[in-house]
Each structure stands twice: as structure tokens, then as C-alpha cells.
Amino acid sequence: MSEQRQNPEQEVELNEDLAKMEADVEAAVQAAEEHAEQEQSPEAEIAMLYAELEVAKQTIADQKDGVVRAAADVENMRRRAAQDVEKAHKFALEKFANELLPVIDNLERAIEFSDKENETLKPVLEGISMTVKSFNDAVAKFGVEIVNPQGEQFNPEFHQAMSIQPSNDVSPNTVLAVMQKGYTLNGRLLRPAMVMVSKAADA
């Protein structure tokens, strides 16, 4: 029995089927190759994750450092502002005290050089004395203190020697007399006390 020959239409159809199968195989092979290229080994994936983790850590560290610097800047600004306010307050108080000291000096001189035996002047002197005390009490509330070193050792930080007097009654460098009181403001010198200082008498 002789082989049955295919008609031309069947041959065309068979060729088309073969071509389609070849195309499908090529597509499958290409897809497999692309997938293989995209796939990474577990070691490579772990290495990539570690790299991403390090980047994330560095980002967090940078952000934390920025927050710390910003907080430090804010604290420095707050401290400087507080210092500026304190300096302004002290400067205003110092200026006020320096303006007031000559007034107190004049009132004290009025008492010192007045005729204390004059009965007519006694009420006036008492009033002036009360005024001086009120002034001193008022400024003391703001940290102003009197420097009246009568009988104390001379201290060049708070005293200004106007004259030196020989004396056998006290040790050398003792304040014999206070010509003008000094004042401090919160421990800082406003005005030195003007004094007479002793020295050893000649033998």
C-alpha cells in the first residue's frame, strides 16, 4: 500500500504549526534566560539587604545628629537670651545706683557738717537721717551694699587710699578714716571707699 500523499493545503497548515511551535520554544527559552539573569543567589540578596541596612542606619544617624545640633542651637539661643536679659537688668540697676549714690553722699554730708547742737535743726537732721536710711534700705533690696571699712585692713580691690598716716595705735595698712563710703552691687564694686591708711610710725 503506497503512502498517502498530503495535499498542498495540509502541508501549509503543518508548516504553520511547526513554525508556531518553534516560536513558542524560543520564547520559553528567552523567558527562562531572563528569569535566570534576574534571580540572585541567597548570598547576593543578603549582601544587598546588609547594604540597604547600612544606608538606613546612616540616614537615621544623620537625622539624629541634625536633631541634636538643632536642640543644642535652641539651648544656646535660650541661654544667650537669658544672659542678655540679665546683663541689661544689671546694667540698668548699676546705672540707677550710680545716679543715686551722689544724692546719698550729699545727704550724709549735710548731716556731718550741720550744727547738731542747734535745736531748730534737729528735726531737719532727723528727717534727713531717715531719708538716708530709706535710700540705703531701698538699694540694699537690689543687692547694693555699703563699703565702710573703718578699722579694717586696707583692701585695694574695694578701697582707694587718699592719704597715709603714721600710727602706733593700729597695725600698718589699717583704715584710720573713711572719707567717702564705697558701694558694691551683688558683690561687684560700684565705687571704692576713699580712705586714710595707717603706716608704722617712725621710731
UniProtKB/Swiss-Prot annotation:
Disulfide bonds: none annotated. InterPro entries: GrpE, GrpE_coiled_coil, GrpE_head. Keywords: Chaperone, Cytoplasm, Stress response. One of its GO terms (cellular component) is cytosol. The keyword Cytoplasm applies. The keyword Chaperone applies. Transmembrane segments: none annotated. Its main location: cytoplasm. GO terms for molecular function: adenyl-nucleotide exchange factor activity; protein homodimerization activity; protein-folding chaperone binding; unfolded protein binding. GO terms for biological process: protein folding. It comes from the Bacteria. It is found in: Cytoplasm. Pfam families: GrpE. NCBIfam families: PRK14139.1, PRK14140.1, PRK14150.1. Homodimer. Participates actively in the response to hyperosmotic and heat shock by preventing the aggregation of stress-denatured proteins, in association with DnaK and GrpE. It is the nucleotide exchange factor for DnaK and may function as a thermosensor. Unfolded proteins bind initially to DnaJ; upon interaction with the DnaJ-bound protein, DnaK hydrolyzes its bound ATP, resulting in the formation of a stable complex. GrpE releases ADP from DnaK; ATP binding to DnaK triggers the release of the substrate protein, thus completing the reaction cycle. PANTHER family: GRPE PROTEIN, GRPE PROTEIN HOMOLOG, MITOCHONDRIAL. Belongs to the GrpE family. This is Protein GrpE. It comes from Pseudoalteromonas translucida (strain TAC 125).
